[in-house]
Amino acid sequence: IAIVGVFFFALQYAAQAGWSAGIKRIPLAFGSWLPIAGILMLVSFFVFGHDLFHWTHHDLYDTTSHEFDSIINAKKAYFFWPLSEHPSTPVFFIARMLFFFGLWYYLFTKLRKLAFQEDLEGGTASWYNMRKLSAVFLIIFAVTSSIAAWDWVMSIDTHWFSTMFGWYVFASWWVTTLALITFITIHLKEKGLLSIVNENHLHDIGKFVFAFSVFWAYIWFSQFLLIYYANIPEETIYFVERWNNDQYGIIFFVNLFLNFVLPFLLLMPRDAKRHTAILKVVTPIVIFGHWIDFYLMITPGTLKENGGYGLVEFGTMLIYGGAFL
């Protein structure tokens, strides 16, 4: 959400959009979470890495061990280079994580500085500089966000891969961020702030939530259909573990309902996207729905059939959500 908020901000300048002038500082503020997120990611990896990522177990690369895995061994350079001949510390993986967060935060601070200059000095110089930097940011984001999705999510199921996974994760990030921007905009407006924001602005951002919920469903179905129709065991196992499982089977369909069916039906009428009462109901559901989506991406790969959902899962979500806000 932090980096996609900055993406939303940069997109407005690259596209020369004017409608979002009253709300663009909300997603820009999300970027302040980036250094905290980077620290939490590093701590989580060093503390829980062996539990989260199967590829971190050294026996998988030892040809004399009964745990040796030829498929994972073929990918060791992606994680351990330049120590790939003697895998111990995943230097390349950690370096990418540090590089991504460092680069994202650097670009965020540059955009924020230019935004403040535009407010203080006026004129068009800062605007043109922001537009150029935003275009650069969008290109960098396109590459780094996809690789981050491979590293932090897809590598949990180390044997499995999907060429659409970067797009799929981005779609989930994007819809969640749009829903949060909408919810915070409504909250601030009801508190007497953002007087410039009217029903037309809510309608525009509501259309974004509606349209990209459909986009998420399109990417989900495209990935699912290709794998289902090809019926290659190495690929179908990803969905089998989530569909034919007592722990995840129900959530599999709840995910589709919350992230596509519900927002599609509730936000289809024009008036629904213009009134705060409906948007205040739909957007938290969408945010929670995409938390469910990431739960399905991560938990079956780490806990297998031992996964569940209870106070720990929901409590963690509330703690991180509260800290972010």
Language-model-detected regions and their locations in the chain:
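Transmembrane-helix bundle segments that line or gate the permeation/cavity pathway
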Residues: 2-120, 134-137
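Cytoplasmic juxtamembrane interface segments
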Residues: 7-30, 180-200, 253-260
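Alpha-helical transmembrane segments
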Residues: 18-21, 194-198, 238-241, 265-279, ...
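TerminUS-proximal long segments
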Residues: 64-75, 258-263, 267-325
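Hydrophobic alpha-helical membrane-insertion segments
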Residues: 31-49, 211-220, 281-289
